[in-house]
């Protein structure tokens, strides 16, 4: 069994739709019911990854073995006749881009988000020491660059008292590891990786809760009658995770029955080629250019 840590970095706003409307918001994004954190559920992500494999020219046999056979139209709804070898976890939030008065925007993260990422590194068994997760008061923020700590900072709708980390290494090591593993230093993303190393802000739970609700994007649209060009349906409001959002998930590839090492090696090769440094499409509004994400494999291990 092989586990991969997969980062997803949004190139365009991402709408992984939830089931129910919320007040005036007709099409909200998926969120955890307990924390309110945005998420892309594993069942949604798995379908998108399977479609990416199909678009990349995978043979039907490889698609069926890795992702399971497609549900037949006349079959029982929601029942997959073959589970497939790949387990796809939920893509959980690592860092959310938020508007600031200084440097245009920064990434907000929290002890919850970093602790979950720490668990993912532990589960996958990747080499290297996992940094400690700094502790922080619920109504304060911590930053690495002194430009952020010179005064209180406007972060989204919040005025946040900022300070330097009280312990050495933890936050700085997280910023470096996420920038390297999750964004990468390739020419297309090097600027954002460097910015992340200085502009990742660790904020308390009270602040993060407000940012998660008020720093997503909303789009109001209408549907026109094709003949009269007048409004036929709407307006309706859609919610999106903004561009530059960072998510992470764990993929677990089980070994085929009978210790089929040849197929196992081929499956691993296909996954590495498909997901490492590629642009995938996830979620709705594909024809509007939404849901494009840079995928990056942080590495692989034999965890779980």
Predicted ranges, named:
Residues 1-304:
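Basic, Gly/Ser/Thr-rich N-terminal segments that form RNA-phosphate-binding interfaces in CRISPR RAMP
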């Amino acid at each position: 069994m092989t586990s991969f840590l997969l980062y997803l970095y949004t190139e365009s706003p991402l709408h992984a739709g939830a089931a129910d409307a919320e007040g005036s918001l007709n099409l909200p994004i998926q969120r955890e019911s307990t924390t309110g954190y945005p998420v892309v559920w594993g069942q949604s992500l798995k379908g998108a990854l399977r479609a990416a494999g199909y678009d990349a020219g995978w043979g039907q046999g490889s698609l069926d073995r890795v992702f399971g056979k497609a549900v037949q139209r006349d079959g029982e709804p929601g029942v997959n006749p073959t589970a497939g070898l790949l387990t796809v976890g939920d893509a959980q939030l690592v860092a959310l881009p938020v508007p600031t008065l200084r440097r245009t925007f920064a990434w907000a993260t929290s002890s919850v988000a970093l602790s979950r990422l720490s668990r993912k590194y532990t589960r996958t068994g990747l080499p290297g020491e996992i940094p400690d997760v700094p502790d922080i008061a619920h109504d304060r923020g911590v930053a690495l660059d002194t430009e952020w700590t010179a005064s209180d900072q406007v972060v989204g709708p919040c005025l946040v008292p900022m300070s330097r980390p009280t312990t050495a290494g933890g936050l700085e090591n997280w910023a470096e590891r996420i920038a390297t593993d999750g964004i990468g230093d390739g020419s297309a993303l090097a600027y954002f990786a460097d910015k992340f190393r200085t502009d990742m802000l660790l904020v308390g739970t009270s602040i993060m809760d407000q940012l998660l609700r008020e720093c997503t994007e909303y789009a109001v649209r209408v549907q026109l009658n094709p003949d009269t060009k007048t409004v036929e349906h709407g307006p309706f409001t859609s919610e999106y995770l903004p561009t530059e959002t960072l998510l992470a998930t764990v993929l677990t590839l089980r070994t085929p029955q009978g210790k089929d090492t040849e197929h196992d090696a081929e499956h691993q090769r296909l996954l590495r080629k498909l997901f490492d440094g590629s642009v995938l499409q996830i979620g709705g509004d594909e024809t509007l250019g939404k849901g494009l994400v840079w995928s990056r494999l942080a590495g692989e291990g034999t965890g779980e």
